[in-house]
Design a protein with these regions (language model features):
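Alpha-helix N-cap/loop-to-helix initiation residues
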Residues: 73, 100-101, 214-218, 328
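Flexible mid-to-C-terminal extensions adjoining Fe-S/redox cofactors in radical SAM and related proteins
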Residues: 5-11, 34, 307-308, 312-362
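Residue-level signal for mature regions of secreted extracellular proteins and peptides
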Residues: 17, 21-24, 286, 304, ...
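Radical SAM enzyme [4Fe-4S]-AdoMet core and its adjacent flexible, acidic
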Residues: 7, 11, 90, 112-146, ...
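Conserved alpha-helical substructure of the radical SAM core
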Residues: 2-161, 165
């Protein structure tokens, strides 16, 4: 009898995505969350802990995905990872691999002093060497003005030591022009991503890359796979473009036509044979009939404003549309205790597609 009671009460959230910060240093054209460097919403650590404790008390968490925005801009990201791992939760972090450069004021002062010393030396020994003067000035200015940085080996080694199970990078463009256009960034942050990717692989973390085929980048999949092979990254996931947030605004510019999708699938088949790692094919390549939707059944997504969604694909759906399918949208700040799911089961047809289809038919 006791066993049956426990079966009714203990319900595990198998897949919990927690968006802990809205801010991101990129300005991606396809971002479903409309994140950028000016956003301010953040989940405080105490709130994060309260939510995790709630789900642990009601049955547990199979896998926790920490995302944003850019989670490594959160001041307590390491505490969050440490806390989830202390509870035995499989923990994954989704990152752009680009963070703010932390240049202490005393170090900036030192760089300025070194610059002035070098210029005095030039004035003393090579006063007519304008080329050398310009090189020295531009070099030190690059040190002083740099905004972006990569995840260091020390940081990533620490993440491995505290038990982070996987780190997932967003890599969307091989060519500089493609990366710049899609990610809304320049060369410095692009290099930071590649450095972060290489550093994560070199310290032995489990590394995955997410690639979303879109009009500007789908033909670059072969080159990206070569970069991953060089960096010793063994896994890439091919994901569907979701027209949400800025992705919705730029849908016509980004979403593949059926002809382009077919061409992309042929490219994947071609390069899959030579790629030494694993190419995970998401809903896009599985086909709708093969994908089993577990949104709101085993899976939940918590936005940085506290709204609890069945999964990230619901960000563009209104509360009224969700209510027609008896989907409630509780908030961790006001009614966390109302967050309840069956904890098991899947749907043959994705729930979000059912709602979108109804919207389009009216």
């Amino acid at each position: 009898m006791c066993y049956n009671i426990l079966q009714q009460v203990i319900i595990m959230v198998k897949d919990l995505c927690f968006e802990v910060i809205e801010k991101c240093l990129n300005n991606c054209k396809f971002c479903s969350s409309n994140s950028n460097c000016n956003k301010t919403q953040i989940i405080e650590f105490d709130t994060f802990k309260k939510v995790i404790d709630y789900f642990i008390s009601t049955g547990g968490i199979g896998e926790l995905s920490i995302s944003g925005g850019e989670p490594f801009l959160h001041p307590d990201i390491f505490k969050m990872i440490e806390y989830s791992k202390s509870l035995g939760i499989r923990t994954v972090v989704f990152t752009s691999g680009v963070i703010e450069k932390d240049t202490p004021e005393d170090y900036r002062t030192l760089l300025n002093e070194q610059l002035q010393d070098r210029l005095r030396e030039i004035d003393m020994y090579e006063p007519d060497n304008e080329f050398l003067r310009n090189i020295v000035i531009s070099t030190y200015r690059s040190y002083l003005s740099g905004k972006y940085d990569s995840l260091s080996k020390d940081t990533l080694m620490y993440l491995k030591r505290i038990g982070l199970d996987k780190i997932v990078f967003d890599y969307q463009g091989y060519e500089y022009e493609t990366d710049c256009m899609l990610m809304g960034r320049g060369q410095e942050s692009r290099v930071a991503l590649l450095d972060s990717l290489r550093n994560a692989s070199s310290v032995g973390l489990d590394v995955d890359v997410h690639f979303v085929p879109m009009k500007p980048n789908y033909k670059e999949i072969g080159e990206i796979l070569k970069i991953l092979e060089i960096a010793n990254v063994k896994s890439i996931s091919l994901l569907n473009f979701i027209p949400q947030g800025r992705g919705k605004q730029n849908k016509d510019e980004l979403q593949l036509s059926q002809e382009e999708l077919d061409e992309f699938l042929l490219l994947v088949d071609k390069y899959e044979k030579s790629f030494p790692g694993h190419i995970r094919k998401g809903i896009l390549l599985q086909g709708e009939n093969d994908h089993k939707c577990n949104a709101g059944l085993e899976k939940l997504d918590i936005k940085f404003d506290g709204t609890v969604l069945p999964c990230p694909a619901f960000k563009e759906l209104s509360e009224d549309e969700c209510s027609k399918f008896n989907i409630k949208l509780p908030n961790i700040y006001t009614n966390l205790e109302d967050v309840k799911i069956p904890g098991k089961g899947t749907r043959v047809k994705p729930l979000c597609k059912q709602i979108y289809n109804r919207r389009n038919s009216t």
